[in-house]
Amino acid sequence: MKFFDITVTELHQKLVDKELTVTELVSETLDQIEADQKVLNDFVTINREGALAQARAIDEKGINPDNIWAGIPIAIKDNIVTKGIKTTAASKMLSNFTPIYDATVIERLQANDVIIIGKTNMDEFAMGGSTETSYFGDTRNPWDHTKVPGGSSGGSATTVSAGNSIAALGSDTGGSIRQPASYTGIVGVKPTYGRISRYGLIAFGSSLDQIGPMTRTVKDNAALLNIIAGMDERDLTSSDKKVPDFTSKIGKDIKGMKIGLPKEYLGDGINEDVKKVVRQAVETLTNLGATIEEISLPRSKYGVAAYYIIGSSEASSNLQRFDGIRYGHRAQDVKNLEDVYVKSRSEGFGDEVKRRIMLGTYSLSAGTYDAYFKKAAQVRTLIINDFNKIFEDYDLIIGPTAPTPAYAIGAEVDDPTTMYMNDVLTIPVNLAGLPAMSVPAGFSDNMPVGLQIIAKPFDEETMYQAGAAFEAATEVHSKHPEMEDK
């Protein structure tokens, strides 16, 4: 079974009407994932036994007709802990780690009878933009198997794009949901910082990380956010703001909506085909009644530098816990305690993770703190101020999600500076803690291109409203890669 042309609501109705059982649905989904795994390598762990056991239990008690997620199988990025299911963060360091508790988002999914179908491949510890730094090998883009799917949530994006999962969860620290969503032609959302609990998310940059949904349609995405959002006492950065119905504005027109298009987002370094797709999107939104004006986010160009100092500094602190003592890889043939630390971390971490730990440790050291980390934090404040000023006059901001379409596997993995610049359009959103969506907008040489829609803090509903209106006015989302239906 492929999920190319069916929504969660339609699939739910099939289960309610007993056109198929949850066990049949899950079994077919598992078969399809396993058939494509050798080509795509989008999963680290496939939860066959656990998923089928959960499916049989739901069939036995019956489907709740009022819960559209009951019995629906979804995929989970492998940095979100799942009790009894191996969680590796795509690292040798955690290659045999099985958590003894569930992340808050997993608890909320299971409270709605959602079935965890498996754990998806990713860049190691979410550090990367191509899913090439995984200890378990790179994931391949379903549109072209020689291209990257983006990252770090490349496995989640790939399984949804390939039609093998109707939905997935990812995490976004500097664009890790939105950029792969753009590269694979799906809908990916980074909610407002604090909208979703980070409890049980293996930390990279604690002031930047946010879990979010990845789906084929805007409405499915909003519906998934409905059941995972909300305050959690175990995450003090989670917001106590009331969780609205994120689907409430979907279907409403956008006439009169005022949208800004930053001139910096269509400047040098942006692929010409990407610019063309965005200009066509502007025309579509204008025809729908929105007013789109050129704006400026002058400090956004400093976002990448600020992000890699702040993110790497937070990562160097967060990853100190992986030392071979309590959990994770432990080196053999060691002479003393220091040897345990040094050898375990040297063997357990990949090159990109080591690079960021070293960068972060340097930025936080006594002699360089003021020149690097403190300065980056000041730049972050200026970027936030730029967004706040724009949102005094505009409802939304739009632009390309990524500067280019997906590129060839191996093309940039040894050139970190070039790879880091692929997130130049998404990083400022994380620094400011804003909600943002990537929605399919067009193609360049048969590879998907996404439109990024950025909203005010805790105004995901307006973002979904505009995204759904754009989706309904185009045919882009109805196209899909040529993957064989097993």
Swiss-Prot record:
EC number of this enzyme: 6.3.5.7
First and last residue of the signal peptide: none
Reaction equations catalysed: L-glutamyl-tRNA(Gln) + L-glutamine + ATP + H2O = L-glutaminyl-tRNA(Gln) + L-glutamate + ADP + phosphate + H(+)
GO MF, one example: ATP binding
Active-site annotation: 77 (charge relay system), 152 (charge relay system), 176 (acyl-ester intermediate)
InterPro entries: Amidase, Amidase_CS, Amidase_dom, AS_sf, GatA
Protein's UniProt name: Glutamyl-tRNA(Gln) amidotransferase subunit A
Cross-referenced Pfam families: Amidase
Keyword Ribonucleoprotein attributed: no
Subunit and interaction comment: Heterotrimer of A, B and C subunits.
Name of the gene: gatA
Family: Belongs to the amidase family. GatA subfamily.
Keywords in alphabetical order: ATP-binding, Ligase, Nucleotide-binding, Protein biosynthesis
Function noted in UniProt: Allows the formation of correctly charged Gln-tRNA(Gln) through the transamidation of misacylated Glu-tRNA(Gln) in organisms which lack glutaminyl-tRNA synthetase. The reaction takes place in the presence of glutamine and ATP through an activated gamma-phospho-Glu-tRNA(Gln).
